[in-house]
Amino acid sequence: MDIFFIGIISYLMGSIPFGFILTKIFLKKDIREIGSGNIGATNALRTGNKSVGYTTLILDILKAIVPVIYVKIFYQDFLYVASLCAFLGHVFPVWLKFKGGKGVATYLGVILALSYKFFLIFGVSWLFLTFLFRFASLSSIISTLIIFLYSYFFENNNFSLILFIFLIIILYTHRENIVRLKNSSENKIKL
């Protein structure tokens, strides 16, 4: 299997807009017209239907795990291509005119498939920061930074490069949240 085919399949799997699909099917609403207008799991939770929100979270994680694990088993040389393409599929899905989610749940799927240790570090730091500050966006950004720094200083530098790319894209997708955090107008989450 060649790198192009792996990239396309991973991208297409990552681009399945589960938040959009689930809110259409179960709530008869367009998630892009709810809350932040984002198709991801956090905004799916804002619909008021926790089942839709948590199912979106799980499916957004799984849509990265499936191609990354498959490539990890059969085509190890293309592991980072599959990881990045699945992630980019979520953030820039072809089905929704390249306007997707912020990428955090899909990023979680990638790091879980690549390293359960990174997944645990992310999870613990995200929960701690969320309980401390009550901002999902801030917790996601800082936790992604923590994973990159941990990888850079203590792990494989090849992995650090892909994690740096994820960090830059997550910062980009959270640019409006960053402005709201600076202006003290970012919505806190309820725990």
Task: Show which residues each predicted segment covers.
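Helix-coil boundary and interhelical linker segments in multi-pass alpha-helical membrane proteins
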Residues: 1-6, 65-81, 112-119, 151-162
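Multi-pass membrane catalytic core of lipid/isoprenoid biosynthesis enzymes
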Residues: 46-71, 82, 96
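Short, non-helical or kinked segments that cap or interrupt transmembrane helices
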Residues: 29-38, 96-108, 135-142
